[in-house]
Amino acid sequence: MNKIGVLLMNLGGPERITDVGPFLYNLFSDPEIIRTPFPAFQKPLAWLISTLRSTTSQQAYLSIGGGSPIRRITEQQARELQSKLREKGLNATTYIAMRYWHPFTESAIADMKADCVDQIVVLPLYPHFSISTSGSSFRELKKLRDSDNDFKKIPMRCVRSWFSQSGYLKSMVELISQQISCCESPPNAHIFFTAHGVPKSYVEEAGDPYKQQIEDCSLLIINELEKYLGHSNPHTLSYQSRVGPVEWLKPYTEEVLADLGKSNVEDLIVVPISFVGEHIETLQEIDIEYKEIAEKAGIKNFRRVKALNTHPTFIEGLSDLVISCLEEPQVNIEEASKLPEKVKLYPQEKWQWGWNNSSEVWNGRVAMIVFLVLFIELIAGSGPLHRLGIL
């Protein structure tokens, strides 16, 4: 029987406070997260941003226990999925490839080669495809595969996105309905989807399908929820986690919460639609920051739906995805990592840089000026930004 390696790709996260700075450096070193006009500036800029953000990020992680649970939860998901696949008769072993923290993709590749797997199924733990999540992970995997002749010999199939998969939708409906049932008036409970945002330019200039997939997914969940409950609920979609000076996908979560409070919404069911495991965005940003905003806005009952984690229906759905991937026409790593024709990725290509209104990424000239000012102040330890309390 062929030995199947199932590669689960995820973001990764710092497990200890001392990991926060290096994790941020890895994150911002990715040109699909922060774009610069010149390759030589990528890592210095990543160092600068991670240095400036490290203290604030450390405080956020301290508020949830001192580190991210994403590795532990992903390992639990991997074990449960492996057991489920073996129950179904597959000789499958799961492996984890984190993009920005341990265990890195290189480690998973080494383990799969050592275990002599006969075939690999790549399953990103992102239901929706985005340039900056699944896209980045696929492209990293392809780069490593292209440079490793032994790894290149192993047949590989990929799942690109799976937001419409029945097991995923059913598990979301089950978790949402649990929170709705706790409300005094279940039909009036407001379903509030919040997805991780991306810069608007990713969609409008780069052709990222993420926004459309998120919108389609929220409607699929609402339709399935209505069938499950026998009644419809009002619902809203927003985008969270915006950083930096550029415009991100709207509406922003914090602004929608304020509007819902003005509309006298009392029971709010918060659904983290783009997250399949608990981590900093659910435990700190939603549970602490957004809950406080909602309460100040007058929302009395703020109920956050748990992330899927190892929900049995979800794990069943993941196993079905793996089996379908093996049975259906192959999607190879070249196809999976291919972005829409509109997309231009640095360093191979560049989105438009210059003094124009269409550029939603940092203008290269401004970015370099800011970088130099900040770099000089960090080295010197004094300057106008220090006097203003920014550094």
Curated annotation (Swiss-Prot):
<keyword id="KW-0350">Heme biosynthesis</keyword>
<dbReference type="InterPro" id="IPR001015">
    <property type="entry name" value="Ferrochelatase"/>
</dbReference>
<comment type="pathway">
    <text>Porphyrin-containing compound metabolism; protoheme biosynthesis; protoheme from protoporphyrin-IX: step 1/1.</text>
</comment>
<keyword id="KW-0963">Cytoplasm</keyword>
<comment type="similarity">
    <text>Belongs to the ferrochelatase family.</text>
</comment>
<keyword id="KW-0408">Iron</keyword>
<keyword id="KW-0479">Metal-binding</keyword>
<dbReference type="GO" id="GO:0004325">
    <property type="term" value="F:ferrochelatase activity"/>
</dbReference>
<comment type="function">
    <text>Catalyzes the ferrous insertion into protoporphyrin IX.</text>
</comment>
<feature type="binding site">
    <location>
        <position position="281"/>
    </location>
    <ligand>
        <name>Fe cation</name>
    </ligand>
</feature>
<dbReference type="InterPro" id="IPR033659">
    <property type="entry name" value="Ferrochelatase_N"/>
</dbReference>
<feature type="binding site">
    <location>
        <position position="196"/>
    </location>
    <ligand>
        <name>Fe cation</name>
    </ligand>
</feature>
<protein>
    <recommendedName>
        <fullName>Ferrochelatase</fullName>
        <ecNumber>4.98.1.1</ecNumber>
    </recommendedName>
</protein>
<keyword id="KW-0627">Porphyrin biosynthesis</keyword>
<keyword id="KW-0456">Lyase</keyword>
<dbReference type="GO" id="GO:0046872">
    <property type="term" value="F:metal ion binding"/>
</dbReference>
<dbReference type="GO" id="GO:0005737">
    <property type="term" value="C:cytoplasm"/>
</dbReference>
<dbReference type="InterPro" id="IPR033644">
    <property type="entry name" value="Ferrochelatase_C"/>
</dbReference>
<dbReference type="InterPro" id="IPR019772">
    <property type="entry name" value="Ferrochelatase_AS"/>
</dbReference>
<dbReference type="GO" id="GO:0006783">
    <property type="term" value="P:heme biosynthetic process"/>
</dbReference>
<dbReference type="Pfam" id="PF00762">
    <property type="entry name" value="Ferrochelatase"/>
</dbReference>
